[in-house]
Amino acid sequence: MMLSASGLSLPGRLVDASLEVAPGELVCLVGPNGSGKTSLLHALAGIGGGTGHVVLDGVDPRRLGPMERPRAFTYLPASRDLPWPLLARDLIALGGGGGVEGLDLEAVLDRRVDTLSTGERGRVLIARALAPRPKLLLLDEPTANLDPLWQIRLMALIRSELAGQARAALVAIHDLDAAQRYADRILVMDKGRIAAEGLDGPHVAQIFGIEKVDGRWQPVTR
């Protein structure tokens, strides 16, 4: 396995989470608000302390120095707030690596990021996360504030970044249909725990209060 994590816990937020991810795999994390998706990404990235073991290609990525870390993993936070008066191209360059195609950023590269729309800022931050071509992408709601077309384009881009590569991605996402469409595996989180794998079974109704009827998610009525 490329990534192996065990016993990850953050006080009050994450309880004894363990998972493995293979090279080339895109794993989506789904769950209600506050279920622990962001906390799991934090634990893997070494944000906020906590306990547990993480091994990425034989090393603990949380112990890497600032020069080594971007090649091992990058973390995209859910927040798109960017107070720094940097040009978009300079912010992307801070991530290291080269440019990223497929995000249509040419028109905004010479604009300050604090003047961009939320969707544009999101695409700039995604470009920064992808630029160093890390082994592991930790992406928290990467499709947030993007229009439906861009949501599709972005998830397809992430898939193409992993294709045939010794790289992997964990993506926290609220859209269950998108998770089913693009993920190799889906981990369902609830109350700070990895509660189940996949979206087939009674746990979906219990955790989300929805069920699939004629191919569409609908509230449970019975």
Q: Regions from the language model: what does each represent?
A:
Residues 173-174:
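H-loop/switch region of ABC-family ATPase nucleotide-binding domains
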